[in-house]
Amino acid sequence: MRPSGRDLSEMRPVSIETGFTKHAEGSCLIKMGDTHVLCTATIEDRVPPFIKGSGLGWVTAEYGMLPRATNTRMRREAASGKQGGRTVEIQRLIGRALRAGVDRVALGERQITVDCDVIQADGGTRCASITGGWVALRLAVNKLMKAGDVISDPLVDPVAAVSCGIYAGQPVLDLDYPEDSEAGVDGNFIMTGSGKLIEVQMSAEGSVFNRAQLDQLLGLAEKGVGELVAAQMAATA
């Protein structure tokens, strides 16, 4: 039995509220159970120096957590003068994931920065950030298209992510924090709306796993991502 009482293949309730902030070109508040993330997308008419003059666009991301997003207060990273390794890893992951669904030629020589700020954390913050980040990106690109600044849609496929793991010896979908902290195997699956894999992060946290278990987790991830993409489509329709 899962602590939440959910079935093994049951997602937490998902909601996506768009237009959550008024200044950003795209924004949403995504809730996956008790994990809540504010995602905004900002369009800038510049690109990093390494692609300047190439005609290619760029999508990047930044990630952070509010001090009281967790059970005990975390010190703001700004107060220590540097980002932690976990933060850097996650924001690079978000940027990589979102770029996988973008035609950078069609985007043109501009940059879109997706900011993901965790308001409340209960497991799966990077997955919620990727899923909500794509919605914010979609809304920002819609504005570019409406203004005629891009000719064809640069977003070629939705991108979403979900966690899967082995908890109490059973493969489970969309781990919350109590499950994540005790899982024998923990993984994150990032996929496109068409079912292609972008990235898989899997690790043995207390027990090893075999190919059959990996296939079970992949099947759960496909189900979960399908539900998340449906939520993305409904939010951006």
Curated annotation (Swiss-Prot):
Phosphate binds at R86, G124, T125, R126. It comes from the Bacteria. SUPFAM superfamilies: Ribonuclease PH domain 2-like (SSF55666), Ribosomal protein S5 domain 2-like (SSF54211). Pfam families: RNase_PH (PF01138), RNase_PH_C (PF03725). One of its GO terms (biological process) is rRNA processing. Its EC number is 2.7.7.56. GO terms for molecular function: 3'-5'-RNA exonuclease activity; tRNA binding; tRNA nucleotidyltransferase activity. Keywords: Nucleotidyltransferase, RNA-binding, rRNA processing, Transferase, tRNA processing, tRNA-binding. It catalyses: tRNA(n+1) + phosphate = tRNA(n) + a ribonucleoside 5'-diphosphate. InterPro entries: ExoRNase_PH_dom1 (IPR001247), ExoRNase_PH_dom2 (IPR015847), ExoRNase_PH_dom2_sf (IPR036345), PNPase/RNase_PH_dom_sf (IPR027408), Ribosomal_Su5_D2-typ_SF (IPR020568), RNase_PH (IPR050080), RNase_PH_bac-type (IPR002381), RNase_PH_CS (IPR018336). Phosphorolytic 3'-5' exoribonuclease that plays an important role in tRNA 3'-end maturation. Removes nucleotide residues following the 3'-CCA terminus of tRNAs; can also add nucleotides to the ends of RNA molecules by using nucleoside diphosphates as substrates, but this may not be physiologically important. Probably plays a role in initiation of 16S rRNA degradation (leading to ribosome degradation) during starvation. Homohexameric ring arranged as a trimer of dimers. Belongs to the RNase PH family. HAMAP family: RNase_PH. This is Ribonuclease PH. It comes from Ruegeria pomeroyi (strain ATCC 700808 / DSM 15171 / DSS-3). The gene is rph.
